[in-house]
């Protein structure tokens, strides 16, 4: 079953290639969506795809790329479905 989730990732997540790494990981999982920086220092990831792939992405987001220091991930289900592909905004 496909669904969409929004992840808000806190910590040292900007300036450490978090968005591009999230894009690469999401694409490997076959997810569509986007990753973007927020003005408050967090990264927002909206992803759509199979539940098991979203669960895998959620696990990865808790760690992020090597230079990131993730302190929290807020997850919410959303009704919107992003366009095909995964983008860095």
Curated annotation (Swiss-Prot):
PROSITE patterns: ACYLPHOSPHATASE_1 (PS00150), ACYLPHOSPHATASE_2 (PS00151), ACYLPHOSPHATASE_3 (PS51160). Gene3D superfamilies: 3.30.70.100. Keywords: Hydrolase. Residues 4-89 form the Acylphosphatase-like domain. Signal peptide: none annotated. Its EC number is 3.6.1.7. GO terms for molecular function: acylphosphatase activity. It comes from the Bacteria. It catalyses: an acyl phosphate + H2O = a carboxylate + phosphate + H(+). The active site is at residues 19, 37. Disulfide bonds: none annotated. InterPro entries: Acylphosphatase, Acylphosphatase-like_dom, Acylphosphatase-like_dom_sf, Acylphosphatase_CS. NCBIfam families: PRK14451.1. Belongs to the acylphosphatase family. This is Acylphosphatase. It comes from Alkalilimnicola ehrlichii (strain ATCC BAA-1101 / DSM 17681 / MLHE-1). The lineage of its organism: Bacteria, Pseudomonadati, Pseudomonadota, Gammaproteobacteria, Chromatiales.
């Amino acid at each position: 079953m496909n669904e969409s989730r929004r992840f808000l990732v806190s910590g040292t997540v900007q300036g450490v290639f978090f968005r591009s790494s999230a894009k690469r990981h999401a694409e490997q999982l076959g997810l569509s969506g986007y990753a973007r920086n927020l003005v408050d220092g967090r990264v927002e990831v909206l992803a759509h795809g199979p539940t098991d792939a979203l669960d895998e992405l959620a696990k990865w987001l808790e760690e992020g790329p090597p230079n990131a220091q993730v302190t929290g991930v807020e997850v919410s289900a959303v009704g919107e479905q992003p366009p095909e592909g995964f983008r860095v905004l």
